[in-house]
Amino acid sequence: MKPGDFSARQEFSHQLVKAAVERTQHAVRYDPAYVRIPYPGGDVPADTGVCTDEVIRAYRAVGVDLQKEVYEDMKKNFSEYPRRAKRPDANIDHRRVANLMVFFSRKGETLAITERAEEYAPGDLVTWDLGGAVPHIGMVVDQKSLASGRYMIEHNIGRGPKIEDVLLSWKITGHYRYFGPASSASASRSDQQQAR
């Protein structure tokens, strides 16, 4: 997918949002436990997960393996990521909000952090500080709140996957768009050509 390919990006976002909305049909118990999982394509048990697992599972449904993408980028650029261990760990690194923030800023688009709800589009990823430096992540979906008129968020804050009007409920710390590895490879080539 070329960076300027608007229709391909629009279709990708549409499919990604559909996958995120579908996640609300699953019963998921909030469980942040460290679990050894296969690589690539590994996942914690389907009935467990945290906020990051909702993002991971939505992307996986459209053919993007964030476990692999994050791990591969961390292997090459470990110093760019927050340090929790001495080396990348494919079992857990993609399940950490701080790592996803770095990954999406490196491989996707970093967008303005604003309280203007109209700046957030379906498929956008939003991160928050829930207070006490507790991070959270969710995805903007194409359903609007009847009360506020804002696009709502698919996320798991401890009650399983839900769609709720929570965009402005906490301090926003990140706003991203990520269209998969083909998009970031194209963007990287474009950046290299512009640098010449």
Predicted regions and their residues:
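Low-complexity, Gly/Ser/Thr/Pro-rich intrinsically disordered linker/tail segments
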Residues: 148-196
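Generic alpha-helical propensity signal that fires on short helical segments
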Residues: 38, 82-84, 144-146, 158, ...
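Residues in flexible loops and secondary-structure boundaries
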Residues: 38, 42, 74, 78, ...
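Generic detector of low-complexity/intrinsically disordered segments
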Residues: 3, 127, 194-195
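A structural signal for short, hydrophobic beta-strand segments that form beta-sheets
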Residues: 66-67, 140, 171-174
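...with weaker cross-activation on analogous glycine-rich loops/strands in unrelated enzymes
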Residues: 12, 17, 75-154
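Residue-level marker of positions within ordered structural domains that often coincide
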Residues: 25, 59-60, 143, 158, ...
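N-terminal capping segments
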Residues: 1-104
